[in-house]
Structure formats: C-alpha cells, structure tokens
From Swiss-Prot:
GO terms for biological process: fatty acid biosynthetic process; lipid A biosynthetic process. Transmembrane segments: none annotated. GO terms for cellular component: cytoplasm; membrane. Disulfide bonds: none annotated. It catalyses: a (3R)-hydroxyacyl-[ACP] = a (2E)-enoyl-[ACP] + H2O. It comes from Listeria innocua serovar 6a (strain ATCC BAA-680 / CLIP 11262). GO terms for molecular function: (3R)-hydroxyacyl-[acyl-carrier-protein] dehydratase activity. The active site is at 48. Its main location: cytoplasm. NCBIfam families: fabZ, PRK00006.1. This is 3-hydroxyacyl-[acyl-carrier-protein] dehydratase FabZ. Belongs to the thioester dehydratase family. FabZ subfamily. The gene is fabZ.
Length: 144
C-alpha cells in the first residue's frame, strides 16, 4: 500500500491534477490498484456542471493513466522516468461519476518494450464498471 506521500515520490503530478489518493495493491512492474475519492470540493465541479456535478471522462482516463504510471515506475529499470500519454484504444464509459463516489482504479501493464508501454485499465465504483481502455505510453527521462 502506498499513501499520498509515496505517490508524490513516484508521480510528478500535483494539485489540482494529482488524481490518485491511495494505492491499495501493487504487483511490482505489472499491476496496481488505486483509489480516487471524489468529493464535492473537486475544482472541476465548479464548471462541470455546477447544478449537475459529473466528473469529466477525460479526468477518469487521467486517473487511470496516473495509476498506470505508478505501475510502470515500480520497475527498477523505469525509476526516474515519466510515462507520457501516447495513445488510447477502446475507451468506453459506462457510468457517471459524481461527488461521494470512490473510484477503484486498476492498471495492468501488458507490454513494455524499450520506450513504449501499454496498459489495460479499468475504473469501477462499487463494482459497477465506469470506464475501460488500453493506454499507450512513451517513457522519457525526467529532467534533472
């Protein structure tokens, strides 16, 4: 399990764009399961939509990409790197995410060759599928 302090050591994202609150399981270099607690105080609800708050789908995908980043960085070979979003396939949204929901974020690295990685990702709320996709990343060194 990784708390927010450990997550910040792995990911370069910060408020308001750090979208992973806690990691609950890790299979080193392979799979990560994480949580995003969606609260009424999220900055994006000010405009999406004030009278009918719904978490934007692109931010659900970003939370899944960040979860994938944590999974990729668990591999010793990828320490000090960043996974840059390079593509997405088969993305489908099945349910809205609203204040009070807890997103369960799952990312499994399915391919890692050179500087290219792919992850199969899934987000659920209380067992209901919210989003699934396959995301591709280009690994790059972090600037010193």
């Amino acid at each position: 399990m990784l708390d927010i302090k450990k997550i910040k050591e792995i990911l370069p994202h910060r408020y308001p764009f750090l979208l992973v609150d806690r990691v609950i399981s890790v299979e080193e270099g392979k799979k990560v399961t994480a949580i995003k607690n969606v609260t009424a105080n999220e900055e994006f609800f000010n405009g999406h939509f004030p009278e009918y708050p719904v978490m934007p789908g692109v931010l659900i995908v970003e939370a899944l990409a960040q979860t994938s980043g944590i999974a990729m960085m668990q591999s010793e070979a990828n320490k000090g790197k960043i996974g840059l979003f390079a593509g997405i396939d088969g993305c489908r949204f099945k349910r809205q995410v609203v204040p009070g929901d807890q997103l369960l974020l799952e990312a499994e690295i399915t391919r890692m060759r050179g500087a290219i990685a792919k992850a199969k990702v899934k987000a659920t709320v209380e067992g209901d599928l919210v989003c699934e996709a396959e995301i591709m990343f280009a690994l790059s060194d972090l600037p010193q």
